[in-house]
Amino acid sequence: AGAPTDKDAYKNRILYHFDDAQIVEIADKRVGLFKAFYQADLNQWYLAQIQILPEYQSHKIGWALITELITKATDNNESVALSVLKGSPARRLYERLGFQCVSESELEFNMLFHSVDRE
């Protein structure tokens, strides 16, 4: 199972909170996209999208970006939420970083990092 792959679904994923997107660069080369935004009503950050080029995925870039977000959240007693597709190997990374599955849909696991869990 995976996310819808039609052109409109792909475009919607890219445009969702597009203003919050950051291009990830290593040595002046664009290697990925990182998109997270703060949800004040929930006192949490939402990690909406992280994409790293395949040839850079073993360089711990995603780990570093997520760790930086977790540190920012922890410093302010905030949580971090995300959704991950079922079957995605990224779920193991999120679990190693302290995220826990709090619910699921047909396609995704919804995960949450509580800053108090790390204290």
What are these regions (language model features)?
Residues 63-64, 86-110:
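Conserved active-site alpha-helix within GNAT-family acetyltransferase domains
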Residues 23, 29-38, 44-46, 51:
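Conserved beta-strand in the GNAT
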Residues 52, 58-71, 92-96:
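Conserved acetyl-CoA-binding loop-helix of GNAT-fold acetyltransferases
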Residues 38-48, 57, 76, 107:
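A conserved beta-turn-beta hairpin within the catalytic core of GNAT-like acetyltransferases
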Residues 73-85:
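Conserved GNAT acetyl-CoA-binding A-motif
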Residues 1-13, 19:
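Conserved GNAT-fold acetyl-CoA-binding loop/helix
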Residues 107-119:
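Terminal substrate-recognition subdomain of acyl/acetyltransferases
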